[in-house]
């Protein structure tokens, strides 16, 4: 693990980056608003907001589609795997960019 320094909230950047994913959109928004200095944390906060917000919208859409419940199981499994991977990568100090979402998150974290 790489020591990354402290954030404006007093936590290590890697810890705060991982916490951005803990409760999905909620912690993403919380850290995006509260963190004033760390671009690393802001990146993970925005990526969390877009990822879990998008998955939430997708699950709502699937609820209205006949047999959408079958696909929702796969979406939930993918969401769980992405949740674990993103938290782990952030904790390790990596700026792990998801396809498409990562580029958008990078723009909004500057």
UniProtKB/Swiss-Prot annotation:
InterPro entries: DUF4870. Signal peptide: none annotated. It comes from the Archaea. Disulfide bonds: none annotated. GO terms for cellular component: plasma membrane. The keyword Transmembrane helix applies. This is UPF0132 membrane protein MJ1443. It comes from Methanocaldococcus jannaschii (strain ATCC 43067 / DSM 2661 / JAL-1 / JCM 10045 / NBRC 100440). The keyword Membrane applies. The chain crosses the membrane at residues 15-35, 49-69, 70-90. Belongs to the UPF0132 family. Keywords: Cell membrane, Membrane, Transmembrane, Transmembrane helix. Pfam families: DUF4870. It is found in: Cell membrane. It is a multi-pass membrane protein.
């Amino acid at each position: 693990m790489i020591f990354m320094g402290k954030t404006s909230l007093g936590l290590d950047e890697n810890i705060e980056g991982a916490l951005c994913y803990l409760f999905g959109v909620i912690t993403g928004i919380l850290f995006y608003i509260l963190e004033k200095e760390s671009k690393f944390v802001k990146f993970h906060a925005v990526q969390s907001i877009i990822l879990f917000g998008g998955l939430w919208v997708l699950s709502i859409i699937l609820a209205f589609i006949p047999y959408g419940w079958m696909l929702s199981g796969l979406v939930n499994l993918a969401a769980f795997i992405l949740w674990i991977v993103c938290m782990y990568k952030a904790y390790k100090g990596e700026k792990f960019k998801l396809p498409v979402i990562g580029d958008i998150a990078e723009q909004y974290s500057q």
